[in-house]
């Protein structure tokens, strides 16, 4: 292999890739969309609210971020998006399951308990939470990732076939003979969370939904192997998102070393660089992986992974 193939411009080249990101109008979804698009990909961003998606698209580098209104918990919406992208491009190379919600209605007893707490109040606080609210967290954070993946399965498969044909044509032009055809295979990346690893917080349903999503994606990596579709997980720590915005403002983006050895929130370059790595030749050998992007948060919690 010559040196040119090992340069950053070759290793991380994603020119012409087609990506879909759920929850792509804000937060981590937007950070990843901008990074992919800035490096040559065409990116469809999905979300329930059209206005934030349209504003997000204005932040593109090359005018190649495309907003599509869609609820990830609606079969009809998902089918509509699949049909739209099939008509426009006919395939995708990357699906990022990023849409997520937090545990609703957290309050004074959503921290680590102490013996001073009135156990009757603790009981009432948790017992009277809504079953529907908690079910909605699993519906969005876990079930929807599976549904969205299967919705786009045929387009991911067509992405593989297109990449394989392009690789064959390239080999023929270069006189490579009948060497094995290699290409970057289609991929699903699901955003989990460090909250799915720890066991010392009280966001019970959120943490459980993210732990379930992580495990489910490992299952899916095995299930989709016959079609050569890869599945990986990114488990982010603290980033300045809608979900963590108030905490970011309160801390000025700084964290104690006991919480994260890097002592700060992650930024757009770090989550953006992660998704570009996974989408490119540099990350093409990754499958069934859980990648922690957390500034060391989980490493501070022994036996958590």
From Swiss-Prot:
The keyword Aminoacyl-tRNA synthetase does not apply. It holds the Pfam family adh_short_C2. The active site is at residues 192, 206, 210. Its EC number is 1.-.-.-. Pathway: Secondary metabolite biosynthesis. It catalyses: methyl 2-[(3S)-9,10-dihydroxy-7-methoxy-1-oxo-1H,3H,4H-naphtho[2,3-c]pyran-3-yl]acetate + AH2 = semiviriditoxin + A; 9,10-dihydroxy-7-methoxy-3-(2-oxopropyl)-1H-benzo[g]isochromen-1-one + AH2 = (3S)-9,10-dihydroxy-7-methoxy-3-(2-oxopropyl)-1H,3H,4H-naphtho[2,3-c]pyran-1-one + A. GO terms for biological process: (M)-viriditoxin biosynthetic process. PROSITE patterns: ADH_SHORT (PS00061). The keyword Transferase does not apply. InterPro entries: NAD(P)-bd_dom_sf (IPR036291), Sc_DH/Rdtase_CS (IPR020904), SDR_fam (IPR002347), Sec_Metab_Biosynth_SDR (IPR052178). Short-chain dehydrogenase/reductase; part of the gene cluster that mediates the biosynthesis of viriditoxin, one of the 'classical' secondary metabolites produced by fungi and that has antibacterial activity. The first step is performed by the polyketide synthase VdtA which condenses one acetyl-CoA and 6 malonyl-CoA units to form the heptaketide monomer backbone of viriditoxin. The product of VdtA is then O-methylated on C7 by the O-methyltransferase VdtC. The O-methyl group is important for the stereoselective coupling of the monomers at the final step of viriditoxin biosynthesis. PANTHER family: 7-ALPHA-HYDROXYSTEROID DEHYDROGENASE, SHORT CHAIN DEHYDROGENASE_REDUCTASE FAMILY (AFU_ORTHOLOGUE AFUA_5G12480). This is Short-chain dehydrogenase/reductase VdtF. It comes from Byssochlamys spectabilis. The gene is VdtF.
């Amino acid at each position: 292999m010559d040196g040119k193939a090992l340069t950053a411009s070759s290793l991380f080249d994603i020119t012409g890739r087609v990506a879909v990101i759920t929850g792509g109008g804000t937060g981590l979804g937007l950070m990843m969309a901008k990074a992919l698009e800035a490096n040559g990909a065409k990116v469809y961003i999905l979300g329930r609210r059209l206005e934030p998606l349209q504003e997000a698209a204005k932040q593109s580098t090359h005018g190649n971020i495309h907003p599509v209104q869609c609820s990830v918990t609606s079969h009809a919406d998902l089918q509509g998006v699949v049909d739209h992208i099939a008509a426009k491009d006919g395939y995708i190379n990357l699906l990022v399951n990023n849409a997520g919600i937090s545990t609703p209605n957290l309050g004074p007893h959503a921290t680590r308990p102490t013996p001073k707490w009135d156990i009757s109040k603790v009981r009432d606080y948790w017992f009277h939470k809504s079953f529907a609210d908690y079910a909605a967290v699993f519906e969005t954070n876990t079930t929807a990732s599976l549904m969205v993946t299967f919705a786009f399965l045929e387009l991911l498969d067509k992405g593989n076939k297109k990449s394989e044909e392009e690789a064959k044509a390239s080999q023929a032009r270069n006189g490579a003979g009948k060497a094995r055809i290699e290409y970057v295979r289609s991929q699903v990346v699901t955003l989990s969370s460090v909250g799915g690893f720890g066991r010392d917080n009280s966001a019970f349903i959120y943490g459980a939904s993210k732990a379930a999503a992580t495990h489910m994606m490992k299952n899916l990596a095995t299930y989709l192997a016959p079609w050569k579709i890869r599945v990986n997980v990114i488990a982010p720590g603290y980033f300045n998102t809608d979900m963590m915005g108030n905490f970011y403002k309160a801390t000025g983006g700084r964290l104690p070393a006991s919480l994260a050895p890097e002592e700060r929130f992650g930024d757009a370059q770090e989550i953006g660089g992660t998704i570009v790595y996974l989408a490119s030749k540099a990350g093409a050998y990754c499958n069934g992986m859980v990648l922690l992007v957390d500034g060391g948060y989980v490493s501070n919690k022994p036996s958590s992974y």
